[in-house]
């Protein structure tokens, strides 16, 4: 069946809209994958264990914390910076406090600056890998274990980096189902 002019135009326009919608839907997971693979945008790597190679060259790591507007927690790095040898495993802590009278769940997102160092900053363990739930008045110290990959000294851009900033932003999220039921139960009066 041959399409006449207006029908052909409609089919082409619908096809363009469908393709654009598909590309928009796929762009978020693709961009996430791209950033993790290349370190673009300050995305960091994840490692199972520390580096086998430790260089004599040192690098300073600064720690930064922020929170989304409306997130009721207090959130800060326990120490603001540390200096370690490239390849050496570092351990830093961030502190979170829930000053409210209700449980609050949060999820941390992170990045590394400068962006050229993102692909060489490897986390072994991090509180950002899972959701956090703080009870009313609860204060916790959350660890992050990391190292700077010795391959950074071979990168034409990143080898000149002397300071890396690890930054976390906490966002409030919905309470997990079990916590929501507990919170609702605490608010009901029973005799």
From Swiss-Prot:
The chain crosses the membrane at residues 10-30. One of its GO terms (biological process) is respiratory chain complex IV assembly. Residues 1-9 are cytoplasmic. InterPro entries: CtaG/Cox11_dom_sf, Cyt_c_oxidase_assmbl_CtaG. Keywords: Cell inner membrane, Cell membrane, Copper, Membrane, Signal-anchor, Transmembrane, Transmembrane helix. It is a single-pass type II membrane protein. One of its GO terms (cellular component) is plasma membrane. One of its GO terms (molecular function) is copper ion binding. It is found in: Cell inner membrane. Residues 31-191 are periplasmic. NCBIfam families: PRK05089.1. Belongs to the COX11/CtaG family. Exerts its effect at some terminal stage of cytochrome c oxidase synthesis, probably by being involved in the insertion of the copper B into subunit I. This is Cytochrome c oxidase assembly protein CtaG. The gene is ctaG.
């Amino acid at each position: 069946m041959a399409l006449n002019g207006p029908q052909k135009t409609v089919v082409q326009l619908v096809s363009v809209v469908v393709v654009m919608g598909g590309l928009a839907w796929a762009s978020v997971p693709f961009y996430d994958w791209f950033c993790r693979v290349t370190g673009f945008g300050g995305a960091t790597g994840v490692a199972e264990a520390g580096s086998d190679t430790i260089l004599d060259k040192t690098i300073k790591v600064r720690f930064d914390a922020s929170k989304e507007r409306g997130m009721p927690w207090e959130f800060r790095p326990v120490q603001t910076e540390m200096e370690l040898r490239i390849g050496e495993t570092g351990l830093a802590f961030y502190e979170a406090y829930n000053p409210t009278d209700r449980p609050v769940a949060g999820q941390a997102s992170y990045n590394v600056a400068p962006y050229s160092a993102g692909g060489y900053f490897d986390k072994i363990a991090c509180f950002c890998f899972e959701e956090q739930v703080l009870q009313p008045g609860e204060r916790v110290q959350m660890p992050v274990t990391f190292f700077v990959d010795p391959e950074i000294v071979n990168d034409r851009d990143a080898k000149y980096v002397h300071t890396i900033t690890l930054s976390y932003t906490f966002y409030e999220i919905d309470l997990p189902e079990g916590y929501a039921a507990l919170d609702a139960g605490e608010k009901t009066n029973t005799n």
